[in-house]
Amino acid sequence: MVIHTCLDEHKTEQFVEDTQRLKLTLKIMDLCRTLPDLDWTVFIVTQHFLKSTELIRKMYTEMTNEERLTLLELILAQLGVVEEQKDCLMPLSAAQFLASCFTDHGRTVLSLSSEASDNQAALVIIWLLDILCEMTSDRKEFMSLQDHPDLLSATVDLLKEIHLLGKNSRNVFTAAHNFTLTRPEGAETHPVLSFKAHLIRLIGNLCHGHVVNQDKVREMDGIALILDNCSIDSNNPFISQWAVFAIRNILEHNLENQKLIQGLRRQGLADDTMLRGMGFRVEERDGSLLLRPLKKDP
């Protein structure tokens, strides 16, 4: 409480320059993890530390992955609180630093496809993605992230790799159609749950009202990639909805992208085995697709 009361903007910046004071910031972060009900440590981080880009950069560099997860969890939680308070959580430059951490190390999450993987390093990427999704959800103070030089291309590339990895072998990135109430142990809490859907969400956010990014997605063959993820996937709830949202943003006021969609050819109905397993079938009538319940045997 005393530290919180004594801190101001100038004193916070001094933590960057002094090794002993930097160790104190890491100790405070450790208390946030081990004693989450201790409000004052959370206040120190959210009301002082997060206001300094250089301190965030320095702390993040010195932290273990476990400590980074605590910091990212606080940032994500505060994004919702700050939205209600109409206050700025952190400077744009700090958000750009987090975006660069995601672009530089995003491929770490691919290690989750193997049994021997560093879950904490991958979890850091997953939390970074969730934060970036929230920051780019029409938050004016962070929408300049749309102009980040590598964020969109890195996100599309990562989606490509994950999509191919899930198709080429059976692993945590493979689409699943298990909608029973009793799913395999750990399926509902696996860290990769919804990761692919959130990649598509971020792409949609970055393309909203941004012609340059819309064109970039087309040039990277990202439109077909997103369309290929419109199927229902129990490992990625709402992925089809995020895909539709992303396509809408990619096509908005973009004639070239609209022409690409118009040039697609219909190749018949997709495999509806999964729908039939849920008691439904797809019926084509007058150029439209209808969802019908399966007829029960008498």
Question: Where are the model-predicted features located?
Answer:
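Extended alpha-helical scaffold regions
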Residues: 1-298
